[in-house]
Regions:
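Short glycine/proline-enriched loop/turn "hinge" motifs that connect secondary-structure elements
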Residues: 99-102, 190-197
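Signature of long, low-cysteine stretches enriched in small and polar/charged residues
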Residues: 25, 119-193, 244
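N-terminal targeting sequences that direct proteins away from the cytosol to non-cytosolic compartments
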Residues: 17-98, 150, 176-180, 203-248
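Short, well-ordered beta-strand elements
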Residues: 109-112, 188, 196-212
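A short acidic-to-branched-hydrophobic micro-motif
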Residues: 86-131, 203
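Envelope-exposed proteins and targeting segments
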Residues: 56-58, 62-64, 106-108, 186-188
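Sec-dependent bacterial lipoprotein signal peptides
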Residues: 1-21
């Protein structure tokens, strides 16, 4: 090979390597920015930061549309699903009272529980929930969908068991005054974390009447799945006794 040709090849190789070495970090940074942007867009219906409940037993990003329940005569009725009055490890509930065209208000409610596995395994939690739900006239034959896989964003549980309940169910349809409990077509999803290595079993229940569900940023199923993906693991040292659930 002529010296001139060899020199040209060497120069081209150096230029190509230099260009590749220069652009590769930029491309990686760009791809990471795109991934971060897409992730932020997916979780846009949730608050930016997680909220801790039950003295740190569970932490997750709440749906931003929800807020602490208003204190009135119907609060204790609304914060728990009517078919799970004994809610395992109850720690908190958040709600949104949505005004309908006739000025009636209907609640969308997220109920949160945290059960240390040293006290009760997730399979026992599920049995306790299912036994109660099947007593409701709308759901006598429902059963768990087991092994719903999600991609956790904070190292939390990747496996959940899900109870999907669509049909007439009780809602407080007049939460600004005397409670008026009526059966409305609605949807409730109950998610129980089923990670075999978890130290705390997280229980999430999201309910919405069909008449106001379209005012949520995404569907009930999508919203509770997003929240479940943000559940953060809890150290055993932080686990304490669960809070008492509201009175029946």
């Amino acid at each position: 090979m002529h010296r001139t040709a060899a020199l040209s090849i060497a120069i081209l190789t150096a230029v190509s390597c230099g260009s590749g070495c220069t652009t590769r970090p930029y491309e990686q940074d760009y791809q990471q920015r795109v991934a971060d942007f897409r992730g932020a867009a997916v979780f846009a219906p949730l608050a930016q930061d997680p909220t801790e409940f039950g003295n740190g037993r569970v932490a997750l990003r709440l749906p931003s549309v929800l807020e602490p329940p208003k204190e009135d005569d119907g609060t204790k009725i609304r914060v728990l699903p009517p078919f799970v009055r004994q809610f395992p490890g109850f720690v908190a509930a958040y709600e949104k009272l949505i005004v309908m065209s006739n000025n009636m208000q209907l609640p969308v409610v997220l109920t949160i529980g945290a059960v240390p596995v040293a006290e009760q395994r997730f399979s026992e939690v599920e049995s306790a929930i299912l036994e109660q739900v099947r007593r409701d006239e709308s759901f006598p034959k429902v059963d768990w969908e087991r092994g719903r896989s999600v991609e956790p964003m904070a190292g939390g549980p990747a496996m959940w068991d899900v109870l999907s309940l669509s049909g007439p169910q009780e809602f407080d349809s007049k939460p600004t005054g005397e409670p008026e409990i009526k059966r409305w077509p609605g949807r409730c999803e109950i998610w129980v974390s089923a990670d075999p290595k978890q130290e705390v079993c997280t229980v999430l229940a999201l309910r919405a009447p069909d008449d106001v569900a379209d005012q949520l940023p995404v569907t009930v199923t999508e919203l509770i799945e997003l929240a479940a993906r943000t559940v953060q693991p809890v150290a055993a040292a932080a686990v304490e006794q669960p809070a008492d659930a509201p009175a029946k």
